[in-house]
Amino acid sequence: MSAEKKKELQVAALENGTAIDHIPPSQLFKVASLLGLEKMNNTITIGNNFHSNKMGCKGMIKIADKFFEEDEINRIAMIAPNIILNIIRDYEVVEKKTVTLPDELIGLVKCNNPKCITNNEPMLSRFHVIDKEKGTIKCHYCERKINKEDIIIK
């Protein structure tokens, strides 16, 4: 990155870590809470309402020396699908991927059916994603459909 380009940055560049970009502003603090950022000792930068040609405005989180596991990424996808995850090493983006819901969620979501076996026995919940755009999921065991707004993340 050129010296002139660095002067234009609104948020400091990361040497190593993860930048979560294109977070809808209304979801930024939900994402931060879901990731447990308040418990991390890493350097964290959170910015909201940055100008975005793609979205109008966006949120961003940068976490130094943190690289997320698959289940952490899947948690983010449940509340803010289509965000961009940038993996940074030595100030360079080495991997960039759009976060999408996987086809199946295991142990990440609580079924909101009180009679579901997953709420009455010591077992992991299992959901099939039936509509990635709307964020609709269906319990594997009781077949209850849950809309994105009603998802309870464990």
UniProtKB/Swiss-Prot annotation:
NCBIfam families: ATCase_reg (TIGR00240). One of its GO terms (molecular function) is metal ion binding. This is Aspartate carbamoyltransferase regulatory chain. It holds the Pfam family PyrI_C. Belongs to the PyrI family. Contains catalytic and regulatory chains. Binds 1 zinc ion per subunit. Signal peptide: none annotated. The lineage of its organism: Bacteria, Pseudomonadati, Bacteroidota, Bacteroidia, Bacteroidales. Involved in allosteric regulation of aspartate carbamoyltransferase. Its cofactor is Zn(2+). One of its GO terms (cellular component) is aspartate carbamoyltransferase complex. InterPro entries: Asp_carbamoyltransf_reg_N (IPR020545), Asp_carbamoylTrfase_reg (IPR002801), Asp_carbamoyltrfase_reg_C (IPR020542), Asp_carbatrfase_reg_C_sf (IPR036792), Asp_carbatrfase_reg_N_sf (IPR036793). Zn(2+) binds at C111, C116, C139, C142. GO terms for biological process: 'de novo' pyrimidine nucleobase biosynthetic process; pyrimidine nucleotide biosynthetic process.
